[in-house]
Design a protein with these regions (language model features):
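Signature of N-terminal electron-transfer/Fe-S-associated modules in redox systems
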Residues: 1-158
Length: 158
């Protein structure tokens, strides 16, 4: 059965009709052509599919599309503004915090949520925010450095 849904996607109103049981990941990738959100394991274990729902990280491979009615969804495509990378995206580039890049959208969105809640996290808080985001290439050290780099201007401002 199809559901007619209204929600905000990357800051813009969105209306869709989709089978209510389809996952948010399927709709983002297949219907809306937002392929930055990755399909990893399909079981919610790797978190490559992380998006923000009302500012909180969710595994879009587990979330039914019907859950987004009236809510705000943010994907990796919505972070850059006016052709300028989000500070976390820029920090990931500067720190070389990726190799194949498959896990990066999920990691960036998880840490965007962290920095909104806590603009000056310590290393333990960063690790906790990334818990479950699996990367088989980079070894995480540069990911931690990237999040610390993005948080640094906030720390200096305090």
């Amino acid at each position: 059965m199809n559901a007619n849904l209204q929600f905000t996607l990357n800051g813009k109103p969105q209306r869709i009709s989709a089978e209510a049981r389809r996952t948010l990941l399927e709709v983002l990738r297949e219907d809306l052509d937002l392929t930055g959100t990755k399909y990893g394991c399909g079981e919610g274990q790797c978190r490559a599919c992380t998006v923000l729902l009302d500012g909180n990280p969710v595994r879009s491979c587990l979330a039914e599309i019907s859950e987004v009615e009236g809510r705000k969804v943010e994907t990796i495509e919505g972070l850059a503004q006016n052709g300028k990378l989000h500070p976390l995206q820029e920090a990931f580039v500067q720190e070389g915090a990726m190799q194949c890049g498959y896990c990066v959208p999920g990691m960036i969105l998880a840490t965007v949520a962290l920095l909104k809640r806590n603009p000056t996290p310590d290393q333990t808080q960063i690790i906790e925010a990334l818990n479950g985001n699996i990367c088989r290439c980079c070894g995480y050290v540069n990911v931690l450095k990237a999040v610390q780099r993005a948080a640094q201007p906030r720390k200096e401002a305090q």
